[in-house]
A protein has these predicted regions:
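Single conserved hydrophobic/aromatic residue that forms the stacking wall/gate
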Residues: 1-14
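A generic helix-loop boundary/linker signal
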Residues: 2-3, 57, 198
Length: 232
């Protein structure tokens, strides 16, 4: 990456391309790139990974559009007279991108998300949560419904028999209608500090980058710039 550029951005871009192959097919080409012995070989597999990543981006956008259409019809509406406090969507999504869909919807609507792919005989689900909810402990309350289950407080994945999906949906809607009864979804942006625009310089960028790697448990710092106008 160029001097002064964000290490987080660089890591994300590289990771997206390495992960895209495994999401849509298998990760062999990613491994071949990492094991390349010369620039010609590396360029060959880098182009393949870039194609996979573009395909992943297109499929992800299409799938999120489909999921949001479903939200408009059902998931954000009243269910059995109660406000629904969870996004729960099933469909013929590619299993490799259901986590990306769940992340996007949780980020947008500030609600726990469960996205289930029903492409195979055993359905696969991916969940993303909000700070108020320990999603893995919540799912463990209904452990008998799953074939397999794993994760952590912020995200989880599972496999489930199709006939158990309606039961899971009913149980989760009931659970969250009680546990999040007073929760009002909002896309609140939390900032770590106010900053003057004059503080945006190479020295401070390097200091921030020295705190990486960023991710769950070590989020990238968020700064507030007041009275700043952005022109296109």
């Amino acid at each position: 990456a160029k001097q002064g550029s964000s290490s987080a951005a660089s890591v994300v871009l590289k990771r997206q391309r390495l992960n895209a192959t495994g999401r849509l097919a298998d990760a062999t080409d990613s491994l071949r790139l990492l094991c390349s012995q010369n620039s010609l070989q590396a360029s060959k597999y880098a182009r393949i990974l870039e194609d996979h990543n573009q395909n992943r981006q297109e499929l992800q956008k299409e799938s999120i559009d489909v999921a949001e259409e479903s939200l408009g019809r059902d998931a954000i509406n009243h269910v059995s007279g109660q406000n629904n406090k969870i996004i729960f969507i099933t469909g013929s999504f590619n299993p490799g991108i259901i986590g990306l869909i769940a992340s996007r919807l949780t980020q947008k609507y500030a609600l726990p998300s469960v996205i289930i792919s029903t492409q195979d005989n055993i359905a696969r689900g991916s969940c993303r949560s909000i700070p108020e909810v320990d999603i893995i402990n919540t799912l463990r309350k209904f452990n008998d419904l799953f074939v397999d289950l794993g994760g952590h407080p912020g995200a989880a994945g599972f496999s489930i028999l199709p006939q158990n999906i309606p039961k899971l949906k009913k149980q989760l809607i009931k659970h969250f209608s009680l546990s999040l009864d007073n929760y009002l979804p909002s896309n609140t942006i939390f900032v770590d500090a106010r900053m003057d625009i004059s503080a945006v310089n190479l020295k401070n960028i390097k200091l921030i980058n020295s705190l990486s790697r960023f991710g769950i448990g070590n989020q990238e710092p968020q700064f507030l710039f007041e009275t700043v106008k952005i022109d296109n």
